[in-house]
């Protein structure tokens, strides 16, 4: 589903507050909106999913939490992009939005039994990327987070991932209201066919819904009152994946270090390091 210029203009005032992923980028080549990313049937495409003060009767406990409300109805008309294992991908937000909520970004994948177009996402999901806090010396209510004000989540398809068709699920979690149980989830699903892969065994795996619980510390976290370590949600990043960017356990990180890839760039299982 393509948005008209009039629709984009109507949405524009709201995109800094709410947003949606609709564009797949493969090795720097940007596709068209929803060419490879399933759309949704939300009253407004950018509506978040929440447990409290819900919109569109959607909560993280529903099957549509896999790819968003009504997304499977778009699966057949959504293309499946061929991507090489080891290639660099990104999922970009629609209509010029940026992630102007504090919180982590994550990327999950799930292998389709046959084709991505016919897969509802009811199988096993594994995490290939996550990013949390990049600089503990900045404001936890804003730019301390790696994803702050970015328009995309960038990651690498694991080189050892077996060939086949997959769903890729990018997710950004706004935690500005998490202290009151109102974490906001922004997510969608891209359809891809992985080629040139290996014999890896992705895991640990989870199911959606089920991977997240309303009382998880990740979704009842307060960004107020100074820095505190954020407990990343979901399973560990698959060890065969290229890495993560999250420095919430780094004791002394200055701004220069936090932005230097040579010192603190993408790191595998960054949250597991003991400092």
Swiss-Prot record:
Glycosylated residues (UniProt): 220
Entry superkingdom: Eukaryota
Co-factor binding comment: Binds 1 copper ion per subunit.
Predominant location category: secreted
EC number: 1.14.99.56
Binding site for O2: 176
Signal peptide range in chain numbering: 1-17
Any GO BP annotation: cellulose catabolic process
Reactions it catalyzes: [(1->4)-beta-D-glucosyl]n+m + reduced acceptor + O2 = 4-dehydro-beta-D-glucosyl-[(1->4)-beta-D-glucosyl]n-1 + [(1->4)-beta-D-glucosyl]m + acceptor + H2O
Top class in the EC scheme: oxidoreductase
Subcellular location: Secreted
UniProt cross-references to InterPro entries, sorted A to Z: AA9, AA9_LPMO
Keywords: Carbohydrate metabolism, Cellulose degradation, Copper, Disulfide bond, Glycoprotein, Metal-binding, Monooxygenase, Oxidoreductase, Polysaccharide degradation, Secreted, Signal
Industrial and biotechnological uses noted in the record: Lignocellulose is the most abundant polymeric composite on Earth and is a recalcitrant but promising renewable substrate for industrial biotechnology applications. Together with cellobiose dehydrogenases (CDHs) an enzymatic system capable of oxidative cellulose cleavage is formed, which increases the efficiency of cellulases and put LPMOs at focus of biofuel research.
Disulfides per UniProt: 67-189
Induction: Expression is up-regulated on steam-exploded bagasse as carbon source compared to glucose.
GO cellular component: extracellular region
GO molecular function: metal ion binding; monooxygenase activity
Residues annotated as binding Cu(2+): 18, 101, 186
Cofactor(s) needed: Cu(2+)
Pfam (any one): AA9
Function: Lytic polysaccharide monooxygenase (LPMO) that depolymerizes crystalline and amorphous polysaccharides via the oxidation of scissile alpha- or beta-(1-4)-glycosidic bonds, yielding C1 or C4 oxidation products. Catalysis by LPMOs requires the reduction of the active-site copper from Cu(II) to Cu(I) by a reducing agent and H(2)O(2) or O(2) as a cosubstrate.
The family this protein is said to belong to: Belongs to the polysaccharide monooxygenase AA9 family.
Protein name: AA9 family lytic polysaccharide monooxygenase D
Species name: Aspergillus tamarii
């Amino acid at each position: 589903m393509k948005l008209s210029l009039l629709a984009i203009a109507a949405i524009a005032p709201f995109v800094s507050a709410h947003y949606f992923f609709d564009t797949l980028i493969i090795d720097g080549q940007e596709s068209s909106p929803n060419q490879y990313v399933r759309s949704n049937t939300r009253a407004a495409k950018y509506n978040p999913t929440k447990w409290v003060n819900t919109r569109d009767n959607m909560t993280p406990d529903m099957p549509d939490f896999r790819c968003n409300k009504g997304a499977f109805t778009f699966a057949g008309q959504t293309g499946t992009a061929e991507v090489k294992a080891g290639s660099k991908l990104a999922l970009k937000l629609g209509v010029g939005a940026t992630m102007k909520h504090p919180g982590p970004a994550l990327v999950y994948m799930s292998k389709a039994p046959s084709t991505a177009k016919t897969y509802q996402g009811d199988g096993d999901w594994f995490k290939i990327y996550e990013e949390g806090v990049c600089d503990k010396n900045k404001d936890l209510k804003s730019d301390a987070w790696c994803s702050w004000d970015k328009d995309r989540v960038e990651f690498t398809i694991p080189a050892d991932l077996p060939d086949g068709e997959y769903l890729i699920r990018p997710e950004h979690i706004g935690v500005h209201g998490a202290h009151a149980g109102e974490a906001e989830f922004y997510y969608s699903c891209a359809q891809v066919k992985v080629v040139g892969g290996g014999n890896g065994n992705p895991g640990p795996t989870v199911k959606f819904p089920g991977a997240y619980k309303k009382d998880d510390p990740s979704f009842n976290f307060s960004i107020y009152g100074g820095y505190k370590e954020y407990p990343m949600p979901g399973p560990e990043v698959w060890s065969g994946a290229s890495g993560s960017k999250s420095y919430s356990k780094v004791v002394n990180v200055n701004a220069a270090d936090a932005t230097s890839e040579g010192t603190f760039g993408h790191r595998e299982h960054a949250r597991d390091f003991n400092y």
